[in-house]
Amino acid sequence: MKQETTSTNQITEGVIWKQLLLFFFPIVMGTFFQQLYNTADTVIVGRFVGKEALASVGGSTAQIVNLIVGFFVGLASGATVIISQFYGAQDKRNVDRSLHTAFAFSIVGSVFITILGIAIAPWLLKIMNTPENLLTDSVLYMRIYFAGILFVFIYNVGSSILRAVGDSKRPLYYLIVCCILNIVLDLILILVFHMGVAGAAIATVVSQAVSAILVTRALMKSDDLLHLELKEIRFYKAALLSLIWIGLPTGIQSTMYNASNMFIQASLNTFGTDTMAAWTAFGKIDALYWMVNSAFGIAVTTFVGQNYGAGKYDRMKKCVRIGISMALIASLIFTIIFFLGGRSLFHLFTDDTAVIDIGMQMLHLIAPSYFLFVFIELLSGALRGTGDVIIPMIMTCGGICLLRVLWIIFIVPLKPGLETIIFSYPVTWFITAVLFIIYYIWKSRKL
């Protein structure tokens, strides 16, 4: 049964470029604080504990966490898409069922991932060629992190659902609070109590717990179409099937993407601690660009989902064109900034000259190709907003993941070295971007 509202939905009715920016800025600020939230551990550990600890909380550890968390968040994104569509159609009953199913999925999934992550952490780190001197701290960090994975899942799902219905401000406010808390706890646990890597992990888990509580409370207090009742959290068959149908390909795509990064990480680990530390620091700097590109992707997915649900296909296509234009400008700005100020950014993490030189080499190889990923991120987001997830998954898994692994296996041995490994990124981005452009043009002509 559909429910009418008296207020105007600006996503389906307002001036597109203006509403896209109004929606985008809270997301990008939220993503910025999410990165600051994650980077605080890295900066404080790198500056006050040492490069070995820096490599322990980044490198292989970060890749494994991204792999497992990325699969679940990708899977749960199915709820975000269907809630966005039902919300655009003002279908309260299905919005409600999708919301409670998503929370049930988060709880059950977190229990499974906690047990699995704690159990296989040492094995995963060993198969990634993690140096022996980093193994103990890396295992400790991973196990503490996975013990609190419930909070990661709840926050990510809850905040994504809020954004799906057009609320990008409250997730930002909650992240600001929790980011500040994380930094304060890092400083106390690492500098005062000298807890090292364990202190960084505990600070992260406690902060994530606060963010999960805040986003859950927001959904419980909402009196809009979207309202969470703890006693109603359960699996609804139709909602669960829709969540899996849309979310599973996205989860597989995320897993394959992170698995290919793990494959590259394993290759980089053979170069030693300096390269691992440089890759960890580069990852945090690189994330400054990805947070903006990802925010545009989230905005476009939400706008496409709601306009698709409302049957406004021309407006939906215009949202995509405007979003891509904005994201391309942003990619150019970041490339220039990184080339001019990259060395200063690396100094935030370490003063080790060898580590910084290696990091700058990585940055110079990857940053000029940022514009290519705009097409992958935004076009896959647009297609996902319409419920089309299978073909984008195949293109991403084949164009990025499979080709990247094949590059490491067949191309790197022909010219061994760091540059050859890193060059796999722009090559696979180019191929995948071309595939997405062709498919999107064909698909949009059918609407």
Predicted feature locations:
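Short alpha-helical transmembrane segments in multi-pass integral membrane proteins
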Residues: 1-24, 83-148, 192-248, 304-369, ...
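Helix-terminus/linker motif at the lipid-water interface of multi-pass membrane proteins
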Residues: 32, 36-55, 125-132, 188-195, ...
